[in-house]
Amino acid sequence: MRAIEILGGFGLDHLKLVDRPDPAPGPGQVVVAMKAASLNYRDLLVATGKYNPKMPLPRIPCSDGAGVVEAVGEGVSTVKVGDRVASTFFQGWVSGGYNEAVGKTALGGAIDGVLAERVVLEADGVVPIPGDLSFEEATTLPCAALTAWHGLVESGHVKAGESVLVQGTGGVSLFALQFARLHGARVIVTSSSDEKLRKAMAMGASDGVNYKDTPDWDKRVVELTGGVGVDHVVEVGGSGTLGRSVQAVRAGGHIALIGVLTQGDFDTRPLLMRSIRLQGIYVGSRTMFEAMNRAIALHGVRPTIDRVFPMEQAADALGYLESAGHFGKVVVRIG
């Protein structure tokens, strides 16, 4: 089978198309013929050595895949050959809370990922593709969609009539927009691009703020909410934007901390003085994934895909992701 490996060192020029033996499932495992994989910022960090510079190589990158079950191992009864499935980011997180053991089961980091024609996964580490989503659409769900769902729904308990600030127009942010609207919330989006803001508003955002034109975007968000601040912030920027997010959220509000895109100093005092709940979100469990998929199927949610690359151009796909010009998800077609 063909696979993409990080081979001989880190960097996009070390992503190589190689041949590997076809894998066989062990007890409790399945083999999935992968049709597509979607890219996350984490995948870029892994490939360039910034995620874990001591990671053993070679390594197959990427956590988010979708395909067809080709073989099942001994003891597998929940999945059958021919099922259309998506991978779970954490192969060992079925339900309950996150722990260190779960962290060791992350695809495309601690263990080989999904950027290959055939991949062995735990039977508990795949979920049925919801509704009539294509493989390309389904591959956007395991990390980006589930992270947004966890942050807003499972942790944030977003309700109709509340307000949500979404930073940027990447995969997590657009899913957050969709899930917030699904629950009847008002959405404010920030971006450096007026064109992307127009697209986000066409998807249901009520307001857009260009943070290049309005560096004090937190003050503008407060103005848009009548001087109160938003109920929820989907914080993808990291410590470099967190301070402004704290100023943009209402007293007693909720911030889902997801991203690490920027660095900077952060004063924790406003969290205490304004009773703001800051929750770190690291994807989610299979149980959360299944709940999200039921909502996606019921409400007909369609993922936003910016561009699809062939497997041979995986390095170009990651380079495109790095350029930050995308609106939604970047996908690699495998089979």
Residue ranges and their predicted role:
Residues 1-65, 121, 212, 319-323, ...:
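Short N-terminal strand-loop motif that marks the start
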Residues 22-37, 50-94, 110-112, 125, ...:
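Glycine-rich beta-strand-centered segment in the early N-terminal region that forms part
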Residues 33, 90-167, 202:
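NAD(P)H dinucleotide-binding glycine-rich loop of Rossmann-like/cofactor-binding domains
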Residues 102-104, 183, 194, 201, ...:
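Glycine-rich phosphate-binding loop and adjacent beta-alpha segment
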Residues 166-169, 181-240, 244:
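Adenosine-nucleotide cofactor-binding segment
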Residues 173-174:
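N-terminal Rossmann-fold NAD(P) dinucleotide-binding loop
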